[in-house]
């Protein structure tokens, strides 16, 4: 009987103890034994979860018999049933399945996967992508893997040739916030001012960050200003740097564009018929077109990455990346058409001059295509584990880029040339020196029961302009100066951001996670003047003495035998004047709060609010509510409503410059004047206001085994979108406003003035569809399919917000070209289908990317006629094949744009276009009138449309670029 009672007591004790909660501790590590910081441990069937500290250690309240589920980004989930109270040692294995990828973007809670997030988040494994895909820089990679992301190199666009603008969901480059390791990244000092994508915006230079230094990228496709602050209207990009230790990789790749592009021949009037648009691609025997086979754009990239453990714990580390890339230019211009001799018109005069010079029409070809660049980058990422689970972390990114691009060719007897210096004319060059410096440091850990994160991030971008192979026409006429190289000045932007963040998961019925924090940000924009000869007009005289600032322009006989005022400043890019110099600063403070909860089973809600106050324009309050409802283990619904804003950039407020712009082959000096200038005030243009956004999204997620599908519909309305106007011109004999404008422009060495203004409202809406399937394969094989697409619509709402003094001049305030670039300059439909196959040491990657139609619009100038061409959709194929030669060496080769696809050629005849009547009250630009006039019918008149056959492909819109097929080879060495 005693034995029976003893057994019953033991059973009862075990039963009682099994139902009691206790603290269970353990450690999570990878296959090499390295501690995994940030791994999520949850109790299956419960809302209870925790996260490992920097040493991989965790503690969780549970009971004997509970099943723990351990997850970490890039690793397979592992389950563990609690059998006793002994410390738990869990080792995770690397996974090829990214369906359970844990994200930190869009949530301040821990352990959310991208399918569990209340907002759509894409996760891109850069370590895999940089081994598989042909692209090497960040914007190129993202342009082919994220349908909602668009970016291509720009051409003949001043500084924008050297910094690729990037957009999300077709909005502006400045409406997407970029984070590094969760901390705000600064923007470029450059404002995009020429007639290409992102005109008037200030973006972030993603290519200043070496792709080899990145572990993964998260792309939040939802308004998030209430969570992260200004700029997060279209979404947020979070770049997470490498943390690996004890292993390294060196990569060398080289390739070139081996391609055939088409261009028009010099042709006689009437050889193109009305309605004839562009030729079929590769019409080899068509006498109207050249098929130009070239090999150019050679690119060489070398990088090395390695991580070291610091001290005894693997939670303390430093990871270093060095990267170098040399990129040569591409040329996609055609045989120059039109007059060669500006003194006389007609082919006879042109042929006679070319014979005398010993050249042909191709000699005067422009360099239309990608610029030449050389990039040097260094990236450091590290952390030091502190006692009691704390961590000191740091990261730094250094980058230097030297770029070289060109402008329009100056013909031998054009007024912008001096034949005594350049008998054959010249192609002026813009050489950039772009430097990026950033340093982020922080301290995080626990303060009582709260998690804290105190950080400071500093960053700056400088953009120096050196103008080469050029001249100052007025300097030669003044004192026979033959100076051909000029320091045109420097732009500088600096930003310092200090954050303090707190968060806590409350152990209560609704599983509430509370986060709050504050931010202090300082910004400074500087514009440094160039040397005098870069901007001065030396033919401005006072009493016969040169007076470059206040003198009266003197007319003389110019190169084309006409009499006029010689141009001042360096041709292609006149430098910044001393009175253009700026040194402007501002501060902003912010407070935010975020509540994430599960009020009922299967429902996750998130509420966020943020108040920001700027020293230059005041405050803004943004809010967001988002939710996710789990219909079953496999299907969930999610949606969000949010408000947001974007503060006008200091660069937009204070940029002052003069640039040479061509319309219809005619050169103009355009002055971009500050928003607070006398000229802007005279025109009634108000001070810049923040852009305000209202966003809504609804979607669904599906996960069945190794298949996932997300479908998200969205709509974002933006009020008071900031744009760069077209050029206003004044008159010495006009009304008071016109006279003041004339005087102000003349003082800026320009004939026309451009301004920043809150000019319009717009809406973008669409659907994003993303699916992935990891096919079950035999051992040592894997096969993954991905299909993704975005369908979007952008529209301008209401009338242009023109000032009262400019009523009737809406088409200058916001031209049809500007409208077209905003709403039709990016593909509204874009998608891809990719296949990735691996077997043992062999891998194959195949991807087809669909770029939808875009609209090119040209015209204006001295007429009210605009010409519209819709460029048809294209499919670009990428292919790469790789083989692991041994334990350390891997070789791969392949192609970007395997079948050498180009956008449609711009049409050669104005008769091929539709005429657009300018309707000032029309919010769009789609009121066409088919013209049958003799001027348009059957006449080759592409000189004005494509600038003498130099722009065969559109430079205004962003579809798929204009480089053609790119072939490459890559060697990777792991050590």
Tell where the protein language model's regions lie, with residue ranges:
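Extracytoplasmic beta-strand/coil segments of soluble accessory domains associated
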Residues: 61, 139-189
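C-terminal beta-signal and adjacent terminal beta-strands/loops
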Residues: 718, 793, 849-860, 883-975
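Gram-negative outer-membrane beta-barrel transporters
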Residues: 713-719, 725-858
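N-terminal periplasmic accessory domains that precede
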Residues: 86-91, 138-141, 145, 166, ...
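Short acidic/polar hinge/loop motifs at secondary-structure boundaries
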Residues: 58-61, 184-221, 270
């Amino acid at each position: 009987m005693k034995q029976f009672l003893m057994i019953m007591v033991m059973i009862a004790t075990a039963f009682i103890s099994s139902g009691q909660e206790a603290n269970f501790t353990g450690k999570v590590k990878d296959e090499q034994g390295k501690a995994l910081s940030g791994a999520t441990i949850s109790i299956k069937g419960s809302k209870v979860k925790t996260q490992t500290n920097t040493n991989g250690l965790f503690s969780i309240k549970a009971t004997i018999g509970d099943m723990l589920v351990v997850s970490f980004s890039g690793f397979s989930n592992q389950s563990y049933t609690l059998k006793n109270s002994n410390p738990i040692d869990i080792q995770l294995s690397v996974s090829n399945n990214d369906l359970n990828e844990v994200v930190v973007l869009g949530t301040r809670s821990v352990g959310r996967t991208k399918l569990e997030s209340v907002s759509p988040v894409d996760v891109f494994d850069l370590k895999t992508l940089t081994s598989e895909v042909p692209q090497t820089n960040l914007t190129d990679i993202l342009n082919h893997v994220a349908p909602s992301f668009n970016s291509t190199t720009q051409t003949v666009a001043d500084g924008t040739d050297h910094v690729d603008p990037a957009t999300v969901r077709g909005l502006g480059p400045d409406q997407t916030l970029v984070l590094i390791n969760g901390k705000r990244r600064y923007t470029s000092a450059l404002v995009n001012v020429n007639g290409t994508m992102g005109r008037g915006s200030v973006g972030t230079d993603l290519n200043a960050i070496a792709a080899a230094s990145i572990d993964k990228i998260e792309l939040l496709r939802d308004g998030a200003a209430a969570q992260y602050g200004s700029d997060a209207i279209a979404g947020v990009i979070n770049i997470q740097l490498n943390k690996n230790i004890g292993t390294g990789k060196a990569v060398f790749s080289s390739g070139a564009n081996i391609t055939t592009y088409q261009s028009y021949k010099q042709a006689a009037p009437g050889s193109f018929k009305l309605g004839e648009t562009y030729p079929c691609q590769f019409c080899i025997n068509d006498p109207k077109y050249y098929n130009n086979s070239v090999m150019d754009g050679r690119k060489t990239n070398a990088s090395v990455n390695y991580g070291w453990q610091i001290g005894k714990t693997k939670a303390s580390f430093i990871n270093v990346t060095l990267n170098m890339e040399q990129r040569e230019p591409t040329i996609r211009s055609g045989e120059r058409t039109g007059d060669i001799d500006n003194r006389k018109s007609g082919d006879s005069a042109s042929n006679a001059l070319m014979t005398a010079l010993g050249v042909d029409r191709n000699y005067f070809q422009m360099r239309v295509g990608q610029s030449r660049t050389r990039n040097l980058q260094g990236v450091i990422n590290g952390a030091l584990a502190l006692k009691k689970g704390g961590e000191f972390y740091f990261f730094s990114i250094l980058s230097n880029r030297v770029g070289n691009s060109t402008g329009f060719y100056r013909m031998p007897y054009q007024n912008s040339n001096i034949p005594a210096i350049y008998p054959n004319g010249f192609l002026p060059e813009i050489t950039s020196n772009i430097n990026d410096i950033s340093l982020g440091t922080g301290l995080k850990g626990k303060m009582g029961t709260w998690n804290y994160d105190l950080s400071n991030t500093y960053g700056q971008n400088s953009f120096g302009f050196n103008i080469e192979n050029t001249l100052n026409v007025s300097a030669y006429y003044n004192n026979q100066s033959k100076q051909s190289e000029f320091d045109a000045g420097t732009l500088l932007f600096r930003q310092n951001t200090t954050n303090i963040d707190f968060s806590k998961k409350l152990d209560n019925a609704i599983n509430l996670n509370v986060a709050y924090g504050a931010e202090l940000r300082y910004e400074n924009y500087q514009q440094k003047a160039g040397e005098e000869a870069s901007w001065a007009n030396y033919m401005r005289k006072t009493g016969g003495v040169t007076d470059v600032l206040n003198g009266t322009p003197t007319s003389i006989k110019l190169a084309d035998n006409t009499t006029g005022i010689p141009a001042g400043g360096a041709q292609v890019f006149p430098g910044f004047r001393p009175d253009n110099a700026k040194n402007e600063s501002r501060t902003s403070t912010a407070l935010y709060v975020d509540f994430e909860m599960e009020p009922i089973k299967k429902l996750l809600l998130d509420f966020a609010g943020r108040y920001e106050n700027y020293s230059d324009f005041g405050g803004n309050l943004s809010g967001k509510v988002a939710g996710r409802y789990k219909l079953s283990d496999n299907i969930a619904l999610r949606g969000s409503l949010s408000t947001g804003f974007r503060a006008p950039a200091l660069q937009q407020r204070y940029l002052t410059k003069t640039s040479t712009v061509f319309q219809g082959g005619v050169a103009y000096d355009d002055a971009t004047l500050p928003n607070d200038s006398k000229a802007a005030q005279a025109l009634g243009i108000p001070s810049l206001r923040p852009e305000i956004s209202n966003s809504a999204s609804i979607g669904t997620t599906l996960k069945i085994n190794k298949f996932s599908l997300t479908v998200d519909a969205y709509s974002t309305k933006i009020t008071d979108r900031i744009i760069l106007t077209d050029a206003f011109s004044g008159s010495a004999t006009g009304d008071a406003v016109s006279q003041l404008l004339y005087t102000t422009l003349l003082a800026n060495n320009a004939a026309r003035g451009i301004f920043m203004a809150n000019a319009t409202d717009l809406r973008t809406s669409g659907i994003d569809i993303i699916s992935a399937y990891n096919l079950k394969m035999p051992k040592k094989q894997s096969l993954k399919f991905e299909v993704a697409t975005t369908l979007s619509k952008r529209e301008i709402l209401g009338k242009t917000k023109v000032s009262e003094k400019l009523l009737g001049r809406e088409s200058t305030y916001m031209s049809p070209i500007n409208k077209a670039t905003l709403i039709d300059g990016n593909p509204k439909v874009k998608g891809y289908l990719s296949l990735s196959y691996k077997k043992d040491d062999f891998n194959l990657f195949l991807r087809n990317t669909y770029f939808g139609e875009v609209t090119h619009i040209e015209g204006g100038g001295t007429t009210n006629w605009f010409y519209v061409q819709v460029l048809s959709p294209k499919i670009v194929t990428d292919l790469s094949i790789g083989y692991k030669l041994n334990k350390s060496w891997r070789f791969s080769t392949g192609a970007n744009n395997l079948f050498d696809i180009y956008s449609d050629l711009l049409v050669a005849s104005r008769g091929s276009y539709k005429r657009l009547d300018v309707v000032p009250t029309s919010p769009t630009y789609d009121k066409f009138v088919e013209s049958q006039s003799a001027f348009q019918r059957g006449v080759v008149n592409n000189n004005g449309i494509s600038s003498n056959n130099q722009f065969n492909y559109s430079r205004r819109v962003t579809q798929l670029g204009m480089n053609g097929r790119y072939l490459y080879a890559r060697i990777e060495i792991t050590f």
